Amino acid sequence: MKNAFKDALKAGRPQIGLWLGLANSYSAELLAGAGFDWLLIDGEHAPNNVQTVLTQLQAIAPYPSQPVVRPSWNDPVQIKQLLDVGAQTLLIPMVQNADEARNAVAATRYPPAGIRGVGSALARASRWNRIPEYLHLANDAMCVLVQIETREAMSNLASILDVDGIDGVFIGPADLSADMGFAGNPQHPEVQAAIENAIVQIRAAGKAPGILMANEALAKRYLELGALFVAVGVDTTLLARGAEALAARFGVEKKLSGASGVY
């Protein structure tokens, strides 16, 4: 068994990604052909469940883009279900300390290395027990990315990085900026300093730093600092802004207004 995304991170090859929030296999397949290295299927803030994640994994599978799945929480039951339908790389949200990071890793490993329940006869991941030695190969194919997005998590970063089985650490700029008192403004100098310091620290520890940043200049800055998996846009934002721009070119007055948002 292989995990091309995990292999790329280990080799130090920067991976450029796109966030998927439309919760739809048709749009997921459309974007899988766009050329991004990875696509994040979001189960935390988008209206996804195990079934919709499954259909998006199936839609992306024929393409070179690698799927990364974010569950709604660091929940071993939910993680087990996502792994069984074929997710190999998980982005675990709101990890605050080393114990929570260890719990995330344990949820992705079969015993005795972890607590993942054995149900391979029912699992797409094992091709319903058609992959020889799946139970003995699966642990090494798992890629665990933990998300730090508060001052508490930042203060515990060194101990999180010491946890065996953590492949990468993703900085959540929206929640981090809110926790630091700058909600909606991840470009605030204090937030940027925290992000940049974390990227350098993560890379120095031999782990892969990651982030979502739609600001092109900042995304490139993070890559220069050593970030290895950077999502540079969100499908919902691309669709909304693209549709608005097209309407505006034909003189259609925008009916709704609002904040531009973080992404």
UniProtKB/Swiss-Prot annotation:
Keywords recorded for this protein, A-Z: Aromatic hydrocarbons catabolism, Lyase, Metal-binding
Pfam family, one: HpcH_HpaI
Tree of life domain: Bacteria
Transcription as UniProt keyword: no
Cofactor(s) named in the record: a divalent metal cation
A Gene Ontology biological process term: 4-hydroxyphenylacetate catabolic process
Sites annotated Transition state stabilizer: R70
Enzyme Commission number: 4.1.2.52
Binding positions for substrate per the UniProt entry: Q147, A174, D175
GO cellular component, one term: cytoplasm
GO MF term set: 4-hydroxy-2-ketopimelate aldolase activity; aldehyde-lyase activity; metal ion binding
Cofactor annotation comment: Binds 1 divalent metal cation per subunit.
Catalytic residues, chain numbering: H45 (proton acceptor)
Catalytic activity: 4-hydroxy-2-oxoheptanedioate = succinate semialdehyde + pyruvate
Pathway: Aromatic compound metabolism; 4-hydroxyphenylacetate degradation; pyruvate and succinate semialdehyde from 4-hydroxyphenylacetate: step 7/7
Enzyme class: lyase
Known function: Catalyzes the reversible retro-aldol cleavage of 4-hydroxy-2-ketoheptane-1,7-dioate (HKHD) to pyruvate and succinic semialdehyde.
Subunit architecture: Homohexamer; trimer of dimers.
Name of the featured protein: 4-hydroxy-2-oxo-heptane-1,7-dioate aldolase
High-level lineage: Bacteria, Pseudomonadati, Pseudomonadota, Gammaproteobacteria, Enterobacterales
